[in-house]
């Protein structure tokens, strides 16, 4: 398996940012780490081993980035007005810098056109991944979200403004009209949203998202695993093994 490390100064964030790439060829996957996570968590917490069969087979290439959660979602002593705006800086970093980097690497690997990217994450990483998928369906055409929450006000102590709204699928999706141009993109794309029902899981958020998607006619596989399925890496590894082959099918 090919592994590469890159770092560059991010204009969006005003600092150096790091990224690690695993694999060569196949579907590009943007991995968003769990809360407060770093780019090396994909490897250090064992998620690399869960993806290894797909990476070794040339079916996928994973790009693992840093979060900015310590300045945004987790910064409980900060002003939520500024925390959510810092989060938007991070979103611009992903869309304006990381996605072009992914496309550049894909061209090096032989892609003739810009491929769609799978957004993938667990826990708060799933929250961010789902938001990327629903906000930017031109860039992100597949989603694997495990054990996420989809109401952004949860991360900002109930605070709500236009920026929180833009990052909260449970708020913006209900207001999308059925003829919104994104609707056709959602229908072409593929999404898997999975939630356990055991300790530390919050299935209510997924159930509400499930209801909204059905109401809007937005296709997605929304799967609820058993009451023994905890909010834990060992279960996310099992879910990756189960769902990734389905997402990688042509």
Indicate residue ranges for each PLM-predicted region.
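Non-catalytic cap/lid and distal C-terminal segments of serine-dependent acyl enzymes
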Residues: 1-250
